[in-house]
Amino acid sequence: MDFLTDKFSLKNQPSKAGDFFMGGAGTLEHVMDSMDTESFYSKSPAVVAAAAGASKCVQQGFSAIHRAEHHVRMERASPCQENNANYGLAKVEGQTVHTELGRSMDTCCSLAVSPGKSMADKVELDELGDKCDSNVSSSKKRRHRTTFTSLQLEELEKVFQKTHYPDVYVREQLALRTELTEARVQVWFQNRRAKWRKRERYGQIQQAKSHFAATYDISVLPRADSYPQIQNNLWAGNPSGGSVVTSCMLPREPSSCMTPYSHSSRTDSPYTGFTNHQNQFSHMPLNIFFTESLLSGSANGHSFEAKPEFERRSSSIAVLRMKAKEHTANISWAM
């Protein structure tokens, strides 16, 4: 503008173009209209041509300044920034700016959302999605349970007695007769086969148990004649001693070993009860009966050779019995 005022004489001295624009009272169109009027410059052709070129340059400069300031105002009035009071005023102009940049206002706002808020929204969306998935899965798991009638079960059992694995054709025919679907018939046969296998397995277990009990049945109290008749070499080698032992140990008849000494002055002694057979059996051990069977077996000739261990045991037991009987006899004689 200083260049214009120096070269050309103006009729009036108006304010400068910068003051005109920056003051806020005028606009770019007002300035350009005032510069295009004939009364603004002198009427000479050279002045008019120079004024036209200068006005074009000024118009280009003002348009560049206007675009820059427009961008600044739109950035300040962006809807992406929170608590902006100028958003409503610059919304229309902002649409053109963001359209020129290749994105819309919604895209800008979606990019400028705070991270905390976006994470909270994401968690809520995930929870809603999980609830929807759980509802869908629960609805899928819920199955319809078929209740069979007696007629349907009768028809199914008839076919099962013939075959446990019916083919597709048989299942379809059975489904038509029972008014069921082929899938329901197939599932029934699967369950029926599983039940049949379970019963068969249980029956086999019970049969094995009964067979084991019948095979290994042992009586608790066997008879006395079931024992084998074993010969005692000690008594067979000494027949005279065997007769003495037999007469002393066997409770068949009261012998001299067991009979107490009958003294005239001691007849009323309480130890005279040894003559009673009941007292004899009560005071004698049960192994005497086993010794009797051994001795009787040797007499009948149905014996066999015993092992050395058994011989030693039987001999030691016999010696102990002899000592016990001698001690009892001595006590009875002393009485």
Swiss-Prot record:
Positions of short motif OAR: 315-328
DNA-binding region: 141-200
GO biological process, one term: positive regulation of DNA-templated transcription
PROSITE patterns in the cross-refs: HOMEOBOX_1, HOMEOBOX_2, OAR
Localisation: Nucleus
Recorded domain comment: The OAR motif may negatively regulate DNA-binding and therefore transcriptional activity. It is found in the C-terminal transactivation domain that stimulates transcription.
Protein's recorded name: ALX homeobox protein 1
The organism of origin for this protein: Xenopus laevis
